[in-house]
């Protein structure tokens, strides 16, 4: 794990990981995933991990924002995050709801996206979205065509419409068959 309190690590993330390996190669947008995991037994360059826990996502968003803004193409580059704390809105203006299950369960599946979106909106994020079709899939938890279509319908009315193939793409329905492609194309036009 890279230490976001270590200036040398921050420089490496900005200059090598983000600018050189992504932006210099033409990447125009990316998911600045994670940013929330700071083990309480970490040894940091500066600060106590227990006290830094909530600040960690803000540091992650700030590093990404500074790297993008200092790049020659920075005004044309877009990134979004999933983790945050008070003040993260200054650095990350677009948030996604994280990794939902590929099902209709209220607490972890598609239905939980709506209250999560409102919650993030009330927290200062005007642009919030979710993975179309969900992400988490394990054992008997497999995405159905019905779920994929319903989620696509829902996200057609969100600020950002983005699909995800899940962690087990080989067993989950994907938007590749002719009928689903037509539905997705139609809803993409609604979104646009």
Predicted features by range, described:
Residues 1-192:
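Catalytic-domain carbohydrate-binding cleft regions of carbohydrate-active enzymes
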């Amino acid at each position: 794990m890279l230490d976001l309190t270590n200036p040398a690590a921050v420089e490496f993330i900005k200059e090598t990981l983000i600018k050189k390996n992504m932006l210099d190669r033409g990447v125009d947008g990316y998911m600045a995933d994670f940013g929330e995991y700071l083990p309480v037994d970490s040894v940091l360059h500066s600060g106590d991990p227990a006290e830094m826990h909530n600040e960690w996502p803000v540091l992650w968003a700030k590093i990404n924002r500074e790297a993008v803004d200092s790049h020659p193409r920075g005004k044309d580059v877009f990134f979004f995050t999933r983790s945050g704390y008070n003040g993260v809105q200054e650095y990350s203006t677009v948030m996604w709801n994280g990794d939902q299950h590929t099902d209709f369960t209220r607490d972890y599946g598609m239905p939980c996206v709506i209250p999560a979106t409102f919650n993030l909106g009330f927290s200062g994020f005007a642009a919030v979205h979710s993975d179309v079709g969900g992400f988490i899939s394990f054992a008997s938890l497999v995405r159905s065509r019905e779920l994929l279509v319903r989620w696509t319908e829902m996200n057609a009315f969100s600020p950002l419409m983005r699909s995800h193939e899940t962690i087990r793409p080989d067993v989950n329905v994907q938007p590749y068959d002719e009928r689903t492609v037509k539905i997705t194309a139609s809803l993409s036009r609604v979104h646009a």
